[in-house]
Curated annotation (Swiss-Prot):
One of its GO terms (biological process) is L-tryptophan biosynthetic process. It catalyses: N-(5-phospho-beta-D-ribosyl)anthranilate = 1-(2-carboxyphenylamino)-1-deoxy-D-ribulose 5-phosphate. Keywords: Amino-acid biosynthesis, Aromatic amino acid biosynthesis, Isomerase, Tryptophan biosynthesis. This is N-(5'-phosphoribosyl)anthranilate isomerase. GO terms for molecular function: phosphoribosylanthranilate isomerase activity.
Length: 200
């Protein structure tokens, strides 16, 4: 059974939804437009989040100091880098924090291994104009040779999640648009998707 991340919480209601459904991780996005929140909102949301759920900060080419501050004040339990952060950046960040770091990769070609200082890779759908949250899946066969634990994102929802897990056995599945209706988190979709995953 994989771990579950519900990403892109924008409203207090979204926090209450994940508190009901009890995924393993809840994601706060600090970049982009559709699901972006500011640091103060993240602090407030973290205070409302169930203690059993770990918070993930999603950053795109942000200042390392900003990430360190959110880790030190315990707003963020895990760091997800979703931009063009290179190994030098990851190394400098890991020298300053003890939290796990996830590096996102937008998949275009077959991936066999990952030489990275990050603790996990996250595989998402490739797009030339956005860093994630596209709602589109990619060719999962491109990951069939990858053997390390990884996070799987990209168009996952209640209709395809069981197939994805059966095919790839990811460490964690990352859901965002797949648990939304008209651009906002949907409690029923979250509960149903978590239930499917917990039964695998």
């Amino acid at each position: 059974m994989p771990k579950i991340k519900i990403c892109g919480l924008k409203r207090e209601e979204d926090v209450s939804f994940v508190n009901i459904a009890k995924p393993d991780y809840a994601g706060f996005v600090f970049a982009g437009v559709k699901r972006k929140i500011d640091f103060n909102t993240a602090v407030r949301f973290r205070s409302l989040l169930d203690d059993t759920i770990q918070s993930v900060g999603v950053f795109v080419n942000d200042k390392i100091d900003n990430i360190v501050n959110l880790c030190e004040d315990k707003t963020i339990d895990l760091v997800q880098l979703h931009g063009g952060e290179d190994e030098s950046y990851i190394g400098r960040l890991k020298e300053r924090i003890k939290k796990p770091v996830v590096k996102a990769v937008r998949v275009k070609d077959k991936i066999y291994s990952a030489a990275t200082k990050a603790d996990f890779m996250l595989f998402d759908t490739y797009s030339s104009f956005e860093y994630g949250g596209s709602g589109k899946i990619f060719d999962w066969d491109l990951l069939k040779e990858f053997r390390n634990p990884f996070f799987l994102a990209g168009g996952l929802n209640r209709d395809n999640i069981a197939e994805a897990v059966k095919k790839l056995n990811p460490y964690c599945v990352d859901l965002s648009s797949g648990v939304e209706t008209n651009g906002v988190k949907d409690l029923n979709k979250i509960i149903e998707t978590v239930k499917i995953l917990r039964s695998l």
